[in-house]
Regions:
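Alpha-helical transmembrane segments of multi-pass small-molecule/ion transporters
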Residues: 1-304
């Protein structure tokens, strides 16, 4: 059942990505427009998704589940970072960054909510927050090879962290937002999947097919990101008692997502190989339509 839902949802995402590609090729979506959409996603859509996920009744069971999801997220990232460093080290910063950091925000959250319902975003939000923290610390060191480039302000003052703090405050205090605000946030949050996939479609339109399909190293990066890391993460979750059940599956779905769009953003920001980063994002996203369903099929036998 989970595999079928996941396969359906990833296929929907693929169609949306093709829509973005068509809009770009016909001139209806420009580079400037794609950047604006990315900003809307980062500064409006994702915060609404995270805050809404915490608008639920406080219980000790949910609090325990939230803490466990954070612990499992740390374990998943430990696997991803270790594997990426062993394979790429500091020689290939884009490949290291891209395989270590997944697309938990734009792909993981909608997939988790499609499989387990909107309340499941409550647990995957902690995964996305830890991802954000690691990208702005360890990720910066990978990309720039310089520790002094870490911006402490951006580590803590960013849309994901701020929305997490607001969400936790609402969850712990039990404060309910007015219906009109809640409905507005729900409408904005619903843009997450369509907007993110359309932006990815724009990225795909900028890549030459030859560069995308005839580079063996890109296939290796996709294999590491989509097969090796998720399967090792599954093994770790199988060993850890808390890794079994719904929270373990949520963690694995997030950890099995393709190369994060942040790889292209960071590459452009810090003067690295932007075109390669875009190719990694696009190729791994295309392959993830199949690989995520396979990984989840195995996970149902191991940790559910």
């Amino acid at each position: 059942m989970i595999t079928q839902i996941l396969l359906t949802q990833t296929f929907i995402m693929f169609i949306l990505m093709i829509l973005g590609l068509i809009l770009s090729k016909t001139g209806l979506l420009t580079e400037h427009g794609s950047k604006d959409m990315a900003n809307i996603l980062l500064y409006a859509v994702i915060p609404c998704v995270i805050i809404r996920s915490y608008i639920t009744d406080f219980t000790m069971e949910k609090l325990y589940g939230l803490l466990m999801s954070a612990v499992l997220a740390v374990a998943a990232f430990a696997v991803a970072i270790a594997v990426s460093y062993i394979i790429y080290g500091m020689r290939k910063p884009i490949d290291n960054f891209g395989t270590a950091f997944c697309n938990a925000g734009f792909i993981g959250i909608p997939l988790v909510t499609a499989v387990f319902g909107n309340e499941a975003a409550f647990y995957v939000a902690s995964f996305a927050s830890i991802l954000n923290l690691l990208q702005w610390t360890y990720g910066i060191v990978i990309i720039t090879r310089r520790k002094d480039m870490i911006n402490i302000k951006k580590v803590f003052v960013n849309p994901v962290t701020i929305s997490l703090v607001i969400g936790l405050f609402l969850f712990i205090t039990g404060i309910k937002l007015p219906g009109v605000i809640n409905s507005t946030m729900a409408g904005v949050a619903a843009l997450n999947t369509p907007a993110a996939m359309i932006v990815l479609g724009y990225y795909l339109s900028c890549v030459r097919i030859r560069d995308l399909l005839l580079n063996p190293s890109l296939y290796l990066a996709s294999f590491v990101r989509l097969i090796i890391i998720p399967l090792l993460t599954l093994l770790v979750l199988y060993i850890i008692p808390a890794g079994h059940g719904q929270i373990g599956m949520i963690t694995l779905i997030a950890a099995a997502t393709p190369v994060g769009t942040s790889t292209a953003i960071f590459a452009q920001k810090f003067g690295q190989d932007y075109e390669r980063a875009v190719c990694m994002v696009c190729l791994s996203t295309l392959f993830s339509i199949i690989t995520m369903s396979v990984v989840m099929y195995l996970a149902q036998m191991w940790i559910m």
